[in-house]
């Protein structure tokens, strides 16, 4: 998700940020007290207050609204007609909202101030006690960051959510994954993050102990008792031993015990640029997710922003959940070709399609996640991406290598179709900027504005028609 440096800093874990508040965590009382149960019930009821079956959520603030709008247009060219929520934290201009709500090419969209809702939420049976923040200013301070994504899940009117970062460009329609076995069985689908920073973030060690991380400590102290009255999708008991020297109060999954983060190979686990979440199927996990950002003693787990919170919530809810079959990839122009499974590519994040295919060569490039989606020019300089690698593969530590440079990989150059599609997305973004320029620049001359606006609408429609025709040629992977 593209954020400026101030907003990104607000979400960083550090001695003065998020996960150092672990000491405030749920104490593990044998019998949850009334206040805890009231809070949990409130979180559950707020999150389950849905009115639409399924939709897309793209959190925004003013500088990235055009990027989000161009993403919606891109998705519409892929046949995606799902409604879209654009939650913000009081930092999107009314003029921007009014402009884009008038554009029929965008389909069904809704802007709303999620921080206003969060600031007004009180505990059931104790209306003087706020749930997320004491007032709107506190909500602005708290949620004008990556954490807006968490409350966007909580307050979404959609039962089934596909959350996407605005700075994402797709090459295959993501809504295919609503039909995947992974999603249908669990109501979740999470993407893997880089295997890096093995002594930082989730993997930062506690008090110099080389065998205990902040993730270990948080999860060992978490008390699931207040949440156990909420339904969950029960999973089988783990068959693997716990490699960490901590005792857990919940039943862990084999996925956790075998994960790269739990085994101290990485400080990251989830790339939340795309995330599927069914609030009705994952009721307990959704309440736990909400509790991470509530004014309570639960505290927020160790994570770079919101990324890992969906994973923590699922694991602590003792529910079934699903991850991509494939490791995170990369996209960039700096490719060192040393042959298959031996090359290096430096660049930004990319994901291949998350469902295993008949062979690695059949797994297509799925999406890019970077504000550089607007700047790559494959027709001028070759752009490469990392081909599929299974998520359970541990390539080894980065050592002196840059985290942005996955190694031991197989790379591929953008195909003409991929290059054309990316160019189309970039042109869609330029046209959304033109929409906004015309609105502000011609305000004093309504007739001229209408003429220019219709012309811009025509350009958008024409480009979208071309992109639809091109997308019909895409080979659709198996789900």
Q: For the regions a protein language model found, what residue spans apply to each?
A:
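Glycosyltransferase catalytic domains, chiefly GT-A lineage
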Residues: 1-479
């Amino acid at each position: 998700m593209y954020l400026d440096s101030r907003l990104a800093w607000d979400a960083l874990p550090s001695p003065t940020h998020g996960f150092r508040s672990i000491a405030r965590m749920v104490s593990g009382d044998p019998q949850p007290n009334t206040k805890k149960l009231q809070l949990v019930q409130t979180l559950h009821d707020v999150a389950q207050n849905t009115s639409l079956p399924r939709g897309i959520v793209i959190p925004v603030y003013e500088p990235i609204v055009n990027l989000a709008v161009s993403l919606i247009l891109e998705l519409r060219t892929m046949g995606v007609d799902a409604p879209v929520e654009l939650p913000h934290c009081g930092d999107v201009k009314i003029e921007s909202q009014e402009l884009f709500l008038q554009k029929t090419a965008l389909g069904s969209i809704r802007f709303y101030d999620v921080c206003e809702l969060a600031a007004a939420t009180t505990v059931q049976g104790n209306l003087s006690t706020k749930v997320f923040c004491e007032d709107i200013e506190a909500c602005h301070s708290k949620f004008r960051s990556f954490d807006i994504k968490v409350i966007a899940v909580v307050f979404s009117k959609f039962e089934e959510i596909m959350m996407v970062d605005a700075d994402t460009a797709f090459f295959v329609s993501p809504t295919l994954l609503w039909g995947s076995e992974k999603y249908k069985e669990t109501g979740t689908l999470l993407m893997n993050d880089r295997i890096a920073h093995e002594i930082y973030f989730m993997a930062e060690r506690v008090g110099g102990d080389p065998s205990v991380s902040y993730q270990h400590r948080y999860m060992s102290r978490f008390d699931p008792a207040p949440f156990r009255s909420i339904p969950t999708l029960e999973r089988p008991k783990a068959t693997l031993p716990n490699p960490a020297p901590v005792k857990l109060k919940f039943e862990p999954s084999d996925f956790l015990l075998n994960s790269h983060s739990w085994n101290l190979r990485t400080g990251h686990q989830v790339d939340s640029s795309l995330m599927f979440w069914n609030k009705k199927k994952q009721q307990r996990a959704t309440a736990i997710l909400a509790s991470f950002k509530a004014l309570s003693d639960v505290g927020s787990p160790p994570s770079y922003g919101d990324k890992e919170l969906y994973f923590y919530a699922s694991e602590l809810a003792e529910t079934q959940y699903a991850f991509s079959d494939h490791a995170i990839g990369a996209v960039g122009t700096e490719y060192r070709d040393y042959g298959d499974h031996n090359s290096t590519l430096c660049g930004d994040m990319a994901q291949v399609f998350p469902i295993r295919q008949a062979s690695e060569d059949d797994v297509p490039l799925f999406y890019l996640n970077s504000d550089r989606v607007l700047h790559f020019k494959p027709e001028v300089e070759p752009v490469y991406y990392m081909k599929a690698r299974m998520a359970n593969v541990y390539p080894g530590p980065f050592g002196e290598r840059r985290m942005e440079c996955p190694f031991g990989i197989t790379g591929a150059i953008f195909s003409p179709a991929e290059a054309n599609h990316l160019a189309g997305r970039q042109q869609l973004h330029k046209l959304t900027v033109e929409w906004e320029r015309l609105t502000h620049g011609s305000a004093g001359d309504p007739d001229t504005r209408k003429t220019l606006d219709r012309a811009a609408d025509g350009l958008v429609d024409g480009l979208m028609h071309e992109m639809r025709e091109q997308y019909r040629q895409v080979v659709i992977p198996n789900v």
